[in-house]
């Protein structure tokens, strides 16, 4: 296991190939978990990629603003907002600034190890039912901070609203990043995950289960003035074990080129650019073709 060379990176592809070098990023892994068929459309089908949505563009800009806030302090956020062309009235900016102030105060400031640094690790991996394959693990973590009690904090910014389901998926993403840093072996142990969610809106008409996270052992929770939530939690062995099992169960399917459809009436119709093709297939199956 080693840092991937420029030659290895140039020869790699997101197309799973037992005879070549397969690139596996957090996004591609989570994408395959979400829907293997959508993964096929994104990485194997010879079709034009859809342009980024307004939400994706906004999310990228908000990430950049947070990067400046971490590196230069929350007082630098206004300048970053202007430079990135973010709407200064975007409520996420106010809530993120408030959250960063609160977190920095409680942690005694931000001791930053890295921000938005891309890692690419080459490994000869033994995959069940497949054998040895060459893999490049790819990860770019929003931020790695040092915890005041020792150990490191993996930090993830999530735009869009946040709930317990999305929190669980984000936890899996951070487990993926932890795996990469552990393989590198260059840092001290990773002990905490931090989720910063500036778009979160408090549920007022029913119990908000996300708020219960703050009462769990070892966890801390911060709320913005109007919107936004941040949660700091210890890395749990249960989450790591579940991630490892999911990874080991998924890789044989990925390298066996299994492109099953995980149809969901809401998700597919709302978020997938390729839903019409799947709808046609489902309709044909209903008709017995």
Where are these regions (language model features)?
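Active-site metal-coordination segments of metallo-dependent hydrolases
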Residues: 52-56, 163-171
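Metal-dependent nuclease catalytic regions and adjoining charged, substrate-binding loops involved
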Residues: 24, 124, 164-167, 182-289
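Catalytic cores of nuclease domains that cleave nucleic-acid phosphodiester backbones
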Residues: 2-6, 68-162, 183-190, 202-203
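Short amphipathic alpha-helical segments and their helix-coil junctions
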Residues: 13-21, 36-49, 154, 245-258
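Long, acidic, intrinsically disordered low-complexity segments
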Residues: 1-24
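Nuclease catalytic cores
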Residues: 22, 26-74, 93, 116, ...
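A short beta-strand motif that forms part of the nucleic acid-binding face
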Residues: 45, 157-161, 197
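An active-site-proximal "capping" alpha-helix that borders the catalytic cofactor pocket
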Residues: 170-183
């Amino acid at each position: 296991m080693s840092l991937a060379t420029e030659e290895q990176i140039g020869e790699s592809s997101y197309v799973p190939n037992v005879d070549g070098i397969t690139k596996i990023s957090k996004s591609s892994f989570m994408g395959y978990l979400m829907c293997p068929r959508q993964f096929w459309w994104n990485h194997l089908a010879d079709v034009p990629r859809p342009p980024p949505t307004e939400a994706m563009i906004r999310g990228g800009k908000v990430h950049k603003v947070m990067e400046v806030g971490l590196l230069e302090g929350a007082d630098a956020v206004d300048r970053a907002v202007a430079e990135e062309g973010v709407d200064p009235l975007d409520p996420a900016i106010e809530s993120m600034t408030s959250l960063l102030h609160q977190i920095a105060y409680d942690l005694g400031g931000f001791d930053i190890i890295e921000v938005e640094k891309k890692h690419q690790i080459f490994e000869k991996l033994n995959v069940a039912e497949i054998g040895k394959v060459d893999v490049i693990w790819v990860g770019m973590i929003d931020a790695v901070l040092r915890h005041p009690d020792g150990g490191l904090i993996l930090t993830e910014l999530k735009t869009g609203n946040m709930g317990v389901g999305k929190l669980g998926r984000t936890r899996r993403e951070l487990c993926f990043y932890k795996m990469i840093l552990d393989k590198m072996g260059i840092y001290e142990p990773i002990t905490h995950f931090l989720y910063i969610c500036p778009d979160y809106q408090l549920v007022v008409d029913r119990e908000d289960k996300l708020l219960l996270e703050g009462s769990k052992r070892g966890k801390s929770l911060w709320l913005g003035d109007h919107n936004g939530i941040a949660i700091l939690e210890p890395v749990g062995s249960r989450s790591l074990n579940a991630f490892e099992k999911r990874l080991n169960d998924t890789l044989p399917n990925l390298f066996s080129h299994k492109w099953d459809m995980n149809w969901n009436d809401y998700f597919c119709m709302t978020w997938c650019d390729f839903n019409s093709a799947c709808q046609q297939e489902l309709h044909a199956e209903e008709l017995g073709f």
